[in-house]
Amino acid sequence: DIKDYFESKLFWKSWRELLLVFKEFRGIKSLRIFLGGFFWYSVGMQTIILLAAVFGSKVLDLESSQLILTILIIQFVAIAGSAVFARLSERTTNVFAIKIGVAIWMLLCFAAYFVQTAGQFYIVGGVLGFVMGAVQSLSRSTYSKMLPETEDHTTYFSFYDVMEKLATTFGMFSIGILEALTGDLRYSALALTVFFAIGLVQIFRLRGLEKKSATHTN
C-alpha cells in the first residue's frame, strides 16, 4: 500500500530528525541541563495533574460534584497564577521563576500526603492551579530562548513535546509500581518529591544562564 509506505517513511523521517536534534543538544550544555531538569520535574507535574481526581476519589472518597469543583478551582486560580509568575519572571528571570514554581510543587507533594478533608483538598487544588500553567508556560518560553538560531524550530519543539510525553509515561509507570508496593496513593504522592528535587537541582545548575538573562533584562 503506497499510503502506508508513505506514512511509514514520514514516521521514520520524523524520528531521524528528532535523533539529530538530540545529538545537537548534547553539544549545548545549557540546553542539556535544562532539558534534564525539565524532564524530571515534568514527571512529577504531569503525574499529579493526571492523578489528582483519582487521588480525591480513591483516597478521600470525594463525590463527583466535589471533584468537579476542584477542577473549576484549579482552572480559575491558574489564570491568576500565570499572571503572577509572568510578572515575577519579568522582574527577575524565567529560570528564577521556574525554581520558585518547582519548589511549590514539592511542597504540594508533602501537603497531599497529609490531606484529610475535602476543604484541604480544595486548597491543595488551588495551589496546584496557581503553579500548573505558570511552570509549563515558563518552561516552554525558557526553552525557546535557549534554542540555536535557525529559521525552523518545528523539530526542536517536537523534541520538547516528546520529552514531556516520556516524562508523563515514566511518571505514571512509577506511580503504578509505588502504589502496588505500598497500597496507598499518599506514599506515591510523597515519593514524587524526589522527581521535583532532581529537576530543581538541575535548574540550579543554570546559574550562569540566569545571570546572563538578568543582565540582558537590565
Residue ranges and their predicted role:
Residues 134-148:
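Intracellular juxtamembrane helix-capping segments at the cytosolic ends
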Residues 1-35:
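Juxtamembrane intracellular "pre-TM" segments in multi-pass secondary transporters
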Residues 50-66:
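Short amphipathic helix-loop junctions that connect adjacent transmembrane helices
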Residues 113-125:
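Helix-loop junctions at membrane interfaces in 12-TM secondary transporters
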Residues 190-218:
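Multi-pass alpha-helical transporter architecture, strongest
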Residues 177-196:
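A membrane-interface helix-boundary motif in multi-pass transporters
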Residues 80-94, 179:
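Helix-to-loop junctions at the C-terminal end of transmembrane segments
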Residues 96-111:
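Structural signature of the two symmetry-related core transmembrane helices
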